[in-house]
From Swiss-Prot:
Protein name stated in the entry: 136 kDa hydroxyproline-rich cell wall glycoprotein, major component
Secreted keyword on record: yes
Keyword Oxidoreductase found: no
Record PTM 4-hydroxyproline, positions in chain: 8-12, 17-20, 26-29
Gene source species: Phaseolus vulgaris (Kidney bean)
GO cellular component, as recorded: extracellular region
Domain of life: Eukaryota
Subcellular localization: Secreted, Cell wall
Post-translational modification as stated in the protein's UniProt record: O-glycosylated.
Alphabetically ordered keywords of this record: Cell wall, Glycoprotein, Hydroxylation, Secreted
């Protein structure tokens, strides 16, 4: 077991939801 219990667990990978327009329109140009 090489788990580092001394260190806090990594935060869950939960990216912010995309903007509403993303669902019906292409992303804005960069």
């Amino acid at each position: 077991n090489h788990y580092s219990y001394s260190s806090p667990p990594p935060p869950p990978v939960v990216s912010s939801p995309p903007p509403p327009y993303y669902y019906y329109s292409p992303p804005p140009p960069v």
